[in-house]
Curated annotation (Swiss-Prot):
<dbReference type="InterPro" id="IPR036187">
    <property type="entry name" value="DNA_mismatch_repair_MutS_sf"/>
</dbReference>
<comment type="similarity">
    <text>Belongs to the DNA mismatch repair MutS family.</text>
</comment>
<dbReference type="InterPro" id="IPR007695">
    <property type="entry name" value="DNA_mismatch_repair_MutS-lik_N"/>
</dbReference>
<dbReference type="InterPro" id="IPR007860">
    <property type="entry name" value="DNA_mmatch_repair_MutS_con_dom"/>
</dbReference>
<dbReference type="InterPro" id="IPR007696">
    <property type="entry name" value="DNA_mismatch_repair_MutS_core"/>
</dbReference>
<dbReference type="Pfam" id="PF05190">
    <property type="entry name" value="MutS_IV"/>
</dbReference>
<keyword id="KW-0067">ATP-binding</keyword>
<dbReference type="GO" id="GO:0005829">
    <property type="term" value="C:cytosol"/>
</dbReference>
<keyword id="KW-0547">Nucleotide-binding</keyword>
<dbReference type="Pfam" id="PF00488">
    <property type="entry name" value="MutS_V"/>
</dbReference>
<dbReference type="GO" id="GO:0140664">
    <property type="term" value="F:ATP-dependent DNA damage sensor activity"/>
</dbReference>
<keyword id="KW-0238">DNA-binding</keyword>
<dbReference type="InterPro" id="IPR036678">
    <property type="entry name" value="MutS_con_dom_sf"/>
</dbReference>
<dbReference type="Pfam" id="PF05192">
    <property type="entry name" value="MutS_III"/>
</dbReference>
<comment type="function">
    <text>This protein is involved in the repair of mismatches in DNA. It is possible that it carries out the mismatch recognition step. This protein has a weak ATPase activity.</text>
</comment>
<dbReference type="InterPro" id="IPR007861">
    <property type="entry name" value="DNA_mismatch_repair_MutS_clamp"/>
</dbReference>
<dbReference type="GO" id="GO:0003684">
    <property type="term" value="F:damaged DNA binding"/>
</dbReference>
Length: 876
């Protein structure tokens, strides 16, 4: 929109156009009384997106101005819908006094709401973070990508650097809701969130550095360990500038930067996160996933931390062991003098105590941003009262160093609890504009104004009695409503008795309403007291927020400790209920699992068959064969999930497990086209395989399922063999390689660090029975036809397939096919190949007929020997 601001517009519309120019492409919510109004293109866009009624207001150059509006009290629900659609909104409030304004009341944009800058409880998912990220790529010869991300609802601020080719994977790990980039930046990568472009100079090194130094009030960034990350510093400075602008204030709760270094986490690429169904199923559902299974957390903070742990398994053993030891202590600690079974009761006591705590992490952030609601302060006050009980329940956990550290972080200055207890009403109103937020007795002036505004009942009763006696009107009533204020109501039949000092205020069908000088004087005093009371209460609330600002840091530390205790307790409870064990963590690259179980699948079926897995220096690859539906994919995912859980500090579903230091987990499981990107199933498969071959190391865990199935038999077999061989001899990664190419089972004969295993199945009179048991050695059959029969394929098709299978097996080799890599054959060569194939088939058919004609029971030894020589002549 580009409306010219001139005298043809009303003063109010001139003000709107100036503010709209400031908001730019954002939707502008323009406060007018009890509504937020939108005009021109904003009104048309909002009406379309929110299904609002589009009306008109005034004219612009002879054309009616489109207008749409939403009630102030319903703003949050409309904001949530707009943000979900990827829209950003500038909120303009009235900051002047309408009564004192000579022209339009003063207004200004007080906040900008974008997908990555949400802080309101109603707009945020309780169990997931919504980060704001910025990316900056620097250098031409050796380019580096700097990435910064901020969780505005908690104040957590992180930076990292990586190669530009890893940027997409890093963004998938962080999953920001919004990405900031320079206007001129060309970033060719998949990203599902909102993208926001800002001027290039926001990313300039000197300006970005100055932005960070000013925010943290320091002369050097050395204390944040980011001096050697110039690209990340540029991204962080631009991000901080953008975030502060959206909030129209400094971000006091953003108090440090955490620098993430390569090697800190076990890397999971987007394909692996999807295939392992950590927080989302393959069909996009939130359950059943590993997160939904483990999320027994009692607080939203704990749930969010658990989600982060699952997406960020740790490489180093020390922090993992600290978590593991804390969980073990929760499972074994007892109060002094209690019986052996009391460990479970102690854990339940701890978890019950955690129920008392609201989302302190986000409340602390909203205190810093001065957007905290009165009821959130009341819940914070009640939570601080519950802290001593929680602290006492942690005493038996003193054997865990990590538990002791967390208990120490729970300590809060007593002043904050006392302040909230004195200042906040026991059950405050939803918003400060409604009054009733500040507790009685906190401020004497407020108490006096409230008394004046509310203690008028006796006066009204006395006035009504006097007026009835003075006028002789027995049904005269003194009442009040919000529109007309106080009034005296007289029925139509009694209006002739009304005195001269009665002034008509409203006419109804059956009554008249009046005001008297005495009632008017009293009304002015009461309403003035109400207005002054509300103004005083708003001022006191602002003073309370000023006083609470100093406690943001200890509140954030307390929230962090509560979240970790909650997460550890949830993992401990799950381990206790489902017989999970503490894995042994070692330095070398090794996975040794005894009787492991898939954590999600075992909860979904009645009986789950446990299976072990050993991968180490002498056994780096398992070639997995077996029937379709036999459980190969489940087994592979099971191993990966157990390894991942072990690296988060959790117990694992097994009777025993030993897991080494892994650097990455790769998966190539399942088949899917990328229609939008123009990539077929086979192309997707090869792209993922190429990434694994390029990046996996001897410390990586690789899962490859049915590689090569998207092309011809010979091509697929050749590729599968070559990829397996490369992984085994060059990458030397710990590999689970599932295949239907039985030719691959010869690989262990050439490479002793490979081994064959198979998923067992048994045939019975009723068909095939899947045992789901992993056994040593290759499978003997794939049972594809039996699986098709169980799937309901028509019997005629099954019979024909069985006959065709017998024919192909009799030939002893797959039907020749033209591979993708084969040179084109001329017509003569193709004809010759087909002729030779036909001759071979005829010879085999003749041999089969002769065999069928022999009756071994009727032959003498000499006749049997002669028959054998005749058959041999056919083969030579």
């Amino acid at each position: 929109m580009s409306q010219v601001i001139d005298s043809k517009h009303t003063p109010m519309m001139q003000q709107y156009l100036r503010l709209k120019a400031e908001a730019g492409p954002l939707l502008l919510f323009y406060r007018m009384g009890d509504f937020y109004e939108m005009f021109y293109e904003d009104a048309e866009r909002a009406a379309r997106l929110l299904n609002l009624t589009l009306t008109k207001r005034g004219n612009s150059n002879g054309t009616p101005i489109p207008m749409a509006g939403i009630p102030v009290h319903a703003m949050e629900q409309y904001l949530a819908r707009l943000v979900a659609l990827g829209e950003s909104v500038a909120i303009c409030e009235q900051i002047g006094d309408p009564a004192a304004a000579k022209g339009p009341v003063e207004r200004r944009i007080v906040r900008i709401v974008t997908p990555g800058t949400l802080t309101d409880e109603a707009l945020l998912p309780a169990k997931a973070d919504r980060a704001l990220a910025a990316v900056c790529v620097t250098g031409k010869r050796e380019p580096r990508a700097g990435l910064a991300w901020l969780n505005l609802a908690s104040g957590a601020f992180h930076v990292t650097e990586c190669a530009p080719g890893q940027l997409e994977s890093e963004l998938h790990r962080i999953a920001p809701a919004e990405l900031i980039q320079a206007e001129s930046a060309e970033l060719h990568m998949a990203f599902e969130g909102a993208r926001t472009r800002v001027p290039d100079w926001h990313f300039e090194a000197d300006g970005a550095r100055a932005q960070l130094l000013a925010h943290f009030k320091t002369d050097s960034l050395g204390g944040f360990d980011v001096e050697d990350m110039p690209a990340a510093v540029c991204a962080a400075g631009a991000l901080l500038r953008y975030a502060a602008r959206t909030q129209s204030q400094a971000l006091a709760h953003v108090q440090t930067i955490a620098a993430e270094r390569p090697g800190q986490y076990v890397l999971l690429d987007p394909v692996t996160r999807r295939n392992l169904e950590l927080t989302q199923t393959l069909s996009g559902e939130e359950s059943p996933t590993l997160f939904s299974l483990l999320d027994g957390c009692r607080t939203p903070m704990g749930s969010r931390l658990l989600r982060r742990w699952l997406h960020h398994p740790l490489r180093e053993n020390e922090p993992v062991l600290a978590r593991q030891h804390a969980i073990a202590t929760m499972l074994t600690a007892r109060q002094e003098g209690e019986q052996a079974f009391a460990a479970a009761a102690l854990l339940e006591t701890l978890r019950d105590a955690l129920n008392a705590f609201p989302d302190i992490e986000r409340i602390a952030a909203r205190v810093a941003l001065r957007s905290v609601r009165p009821r959130e302060l009341a819940s914070l006050r009640d939570a601080l009262v519950a802290l001593p009980a929680l602290h006492a329940s942690l005493a038996p956990l003193s054997g865990s160093p990590r538990a002791r550290e967390l208990a120490a972080q729970l300590a809060m200055p007593p002043d904050i609890g006392e302040l909230l207890a004195r200042a906040v009403a026991s059950e405050p109103a939803v918003a400060i504009r409604d009054g009733g937020v500040i507790a009685a007795g906190f401020d004497s002036e407020l108490d006096e104004l409230r008394a004046l505004a509310t203690d008028g009942g006796d006066f009204l009763v006395q006035l009504e009695a006097r007026e009835r006696e003075r006028t002789g009107i027995g049904n005269l009533r003194v009442e009040f409503n919000r529109v007309h204020g106080f009034y005296i109501e007289v029925s139509k039949g009694q209006t002739d008795k009304v005195p001269e000092d009665y002034r008509r205020r409203q006419t109804l069908k059956n009554a008249e309403r009046y005001i008297t000088p005495e009632l008017k004087t009293w009304e002015d005093r009461v309403l003035s007291a109400q207005d002054r009371s509300l103004a005083r209460e708003k001022w006191l609330y602002e003073q309370l927020l000023d006083a609470l600002a100093q406690y943001v840091r200890p509140l954030s530390q307390c929230a962090s400790a509560l979240a970790e205790l909650d997460t550890l307790a949830a993992l401990a409870e799950h381990a206790r209920r489902h017989d999970w064990v503490a894995p042994e963590l070692i330095d070398g690259a090794e996975i040794d699992i005894e009787a492991g179980r898939h954590p999600v699948v075992e909860r979904a079926i009645e009986r789950f068959t446990p299976n072990g897995c050993r991968l180490d220096q002498t056994r780096r690859m398992l070639l997995i064969t077996g029937p379709n539906m036999g459980g190969k994919s489940t087994y592979m995912r099971q191993v990966a999930l157990i390894a991942l859980l072990a690296r988060t500090g959790s117990f694992v579903p097994a009777t025993r497990a030993r897991v080494g230091r892994l650097d990455r987990i790769f998966t190539r499981i399942g088949a899917a086209d990328d229609l939008a990107g123009g990539r077929s199933t086979f192309m997707m498969e090869m792209t993922e395989a190429a990434a694994i071959l390029a990046a996996s190391t001897p410390a990586s865990l690789v899962l490859m399922d049915e590689i090569g199935r998207g092309t011809s038999t010979y091509d697929g077999l050749a590729l599968a063999w070559a990829i397996a061989y490369r992984l085994l001899t060059h990458n030397r990664a710990l590999t689970l390689f599932a295949t239907h190419y039985f030719e691959l089972t010869r690989l262990p004969a050439e490479q002793p660090t490979a081994a064959n295993v198979h998923l067992a199945a048994a045939e019975s009179a009723g068909g095939i029975v899947f045992l789901h048991e992993v056994r040593e050695g290759p499978a003997s059959r794939s049972y594809g036809i039996q699986v098709a029969q169980r799937a309901g394929v028509p019997a005629a098709v099954i019979r024909q397939a069985s006959r065709e299978l017998e024919r192909l097996e009799a030939q002893g080799a797959p039907t020749p096919q033209l591979g993708l890599f084969a040179a084109a054959l001329d017509a003569d060569v193709q004809s010759q190949a087909m002729t030779e194939q036909a001759e071979d088939a005829a010879a085999l058919a003749q041999l089969r007929d002769q065999l069928a004609a022999i009756d071994p029971d009727s032959l003498t030894p000499r006749e049997a020997l002669d028959a054998l020589y005749r058959l041999k002549q056919h083969l030579t």
